[in-house]
Amino acid sequence: MIRDRIKTEEYFQEAFEWYSQCLQEDIEDYEKEKPKDLMSHFRFMVINYENLLKVGYSLGKGVQSLFPYYQGILSNLKEVASEGVPFYRAVDVFSLGVLYSERKEEFLDDLRAIYDQMDHTDGLIEYYMVYLFHDKIVPFHSILEYQNMIEDTYESVAKAQDFWYYSHSDAPWYNNHTKDTYKGYWSFDTAATCKIKGIYDERLKDLEYFPYDLLVQG
C-alpha cells in the first residue's frame, strides 16, 4: 500500500521504474568501461540509490527489500565522502543506520569509513554514531531545533514533527511535490531518535512525514 499522501501510486511506480533503469544503465556502463571521472560516477550512484530508497518507501515497498539501496548509498558515498557530505544527506545516512541497526554488521564498516572522512558533524549525528558504534545512548544538542524538542513522550514527538518540513526550507528537495522530481518527504531522523528513546506509540503512524514502518520493522 502506498505510504505517500501527496502523489498517486501510478506516479511513484513510474518513478521507481525510471530510477531503476537509470541505476542499471550506470552499473552496465561502469562494467563495460570504467569512466574517466570515477568520483562523478560514485556521486551519481549515491543519488540513484537515494532516489530508489525514497521512492520505494513512498510507493509502499517492504522495508527489508529497500535495505540493499541503503547499502548502495553507503558503498558509493564512502568513495567520495572526502569531498564533503552535505549535512542533510549525513543526517539521513546515519538515521537510516539507526533504523536498520539490527543489520548493522552488514554496513557498519562503510558507515564508519564515511564518518571518518567527514570534516564537520553535529550533535545529532554524534548521537546516532555513538548508538551505532558503541551501543550507548548519550545526551545531544543539534542545530535542528525540532530534534531538541523530542523528550520521551509521543506528545513531544508530535510537536517536533510539526516543525520538521519547514525546518528544511533550505534543503534541495524542499517544495519538490510541485515538480516531477518529488520522491516523498520522510523524517528518517525523527524516527531514528524515537527508536533510540524507545518511543513506539502507534499514534506515530498518523504523523505527517513520519516513516512509521521503518521504525517498527522486524
What does each model-found stretch correspond to?
Residues M1-T178, Y182:
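Eukaryote-skewed repeat-based solenoidal scaffolds used as protein-protein interaction platforms
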Residues E155-G218:
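Alpha-helical oligomerization segments
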